[in-house]
Amino acid sequence: MNALLEVRGARKSFGGVHAVDGVSLSLAPGEVLAVLGHNGAGKSTLMQMLAGALPFDGGELLLNGSPAKFASPADSRAAGIETIHQKLALADNLDSVANLFLGRELRTRFGLLDDAAMRAAAVPLFARLNPNFKNIAEPVQSLSGGQRQVVAIARALQFKARVLIMDEPCAALGPSETAMVHDLIRRLAAEGVGILLVTHDMPDVFALSNRLMVMKNGRLVGVTQTAAVTENEVLAMIIAGKAPAAPL
């Protein structure tokens, strides 16, 4: 089976700073790959490259085994890659359905917003993600942090995302909402969605990821099966740049 997404030798520089320096990774369908490293390690730059916000200076990107190049975030989204930012980028004054279709609204043949069609598409999607999510008519500013994550993930899936880049999805959530988001991520993976989980939270890493990769100073320290390492070994990778004994 081809990797859903593969990066070979990615490079990105800003002046004399090598923000991403020869980094490679692969992501299989249904896999959760944790992307780790201190601030400034190059994680965000690499994710912006995959999201089409920054061009590659070198290296290669493949989707389902075929080379891909993005000139804009719209190209990345059209290829099935969606990014869920830590701040979620939701319009607080709009309800969940309006956020789901924000910028990609359905319209009638007369050019008017087709509210009925958008609601009809939204209801089963929200039910699929969280059967207890009933507040689709309320402004998202009134929703809890976990419910807002549901809206952001639903927006990505509505447009056939096959790869999700998730930036700190459980930041500032309480235990019950963290558990809800964990369950949601596991169900998405079970459906074949590949997930790049950018996080500093070790419990999230060990609860969710199949593999983890660590970056430091723009370079790849190593990649390993999450179950094959301890938290202390992962911290050694992050802090000291010490690769695991048996990278996978």
Q: Where are the language model's segments positioned?
A:
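Glycine-rich phosphate-binding loops of nucleotide-dependent enzymes
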Residues: 2-248
